[in-house]
Amino acid sequence: MAGHKSIKRIIHRCAEEIDATRRISKVTSFKEGLETFRAKIDIQIMNRNGYYENETRKNHLLRKHDIMIRYYEKTFGDFLKTYDYDHKNKKLPKSEYADCIWVCWWQGLEQAPELVKVCVDSIKRNAGNHRVIILTDDNYKQYVDIPKWVEEKRNKGIISRTHYSDILRLSLLAQHGGMWIDSTFFCTGIGLQEYFKASLWSIKRPDYFHASIAAGYFANYSFACNQEHRWIFKVILDFLLEYWKENDIMTDYLFLDYLIVLVQKYDSQIAEEFKNIKSNNPECDELYKIMGEKFNENKWNELKKNTCLFKLSWKYQYPKEKDGIPTFYGMLVDNKLN
């Protein structure tokens, strides 16, 4: 049965990508539509080979990003020219949640996998005086206002839970500020508190893999801003809501990254703020790659030397031991990784 569901999902995803290619081709050209499809195949290959990126693959991805930005420019049309980019100078009311760390697990932590629980505990442990608010299906409306039409599209299945999370994230940051980090971040130090001192923050590893147009210059699962810079996320949110107001389908899974780059193209002040984010957490993805390996204290000390946030995934099964020796995963879930 599991295999049958997996095959059905693969067929469904292939159909989605073929339809996306058709829509891109109508706006750009047939040749460019095929180029984006080829780049998506490259991404799937990279997902399975440890994200090895040779020069040919990199060029395919960069070409895709160029095509997709032009595609979205045509999709947004006059909105890009008529949008009021000066609204950032209007003062936003102060929020009582400005110092909060926002973490979302829709079903509630009681239903979360062990890895997620450990990660959230690590965030709380290193949050200092910052409140950690766990958002769920039952409580998120207490903290944020989302347009009714968005809720209706979500209930109809037009906006998926993943893309609804994008709207939630941007809405929280636009309305309150504070920090949003994914529930699968394992935090090892007080560096988390330091990021609140910046006007704008995101994990930043310049010239990282090019599967996303972000290429390490930002990571949309990790954002923070102070009260005075909430307008940055208000602009990005306005763009995102405009897209969903006019469209009922997503052309690219990494749309939010394209959107953030598009906003920077049309708003030089936002581009400057992103440029000013200091590089941080260079080893963010490295713990994930060795979760099933035998724990090695020297390797662990080396990883956390200049990184305090490690992005993990709850979707994979890891052994707790290997040849009688605890793995990195085993140390993590036994709360011995610190």
What are the roles of these predicted feature ranges?
Residues 166-176:
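Small-residue hinge/turn detector
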Residues 176, 181-183:
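Active-site acidic Asp-centered loop
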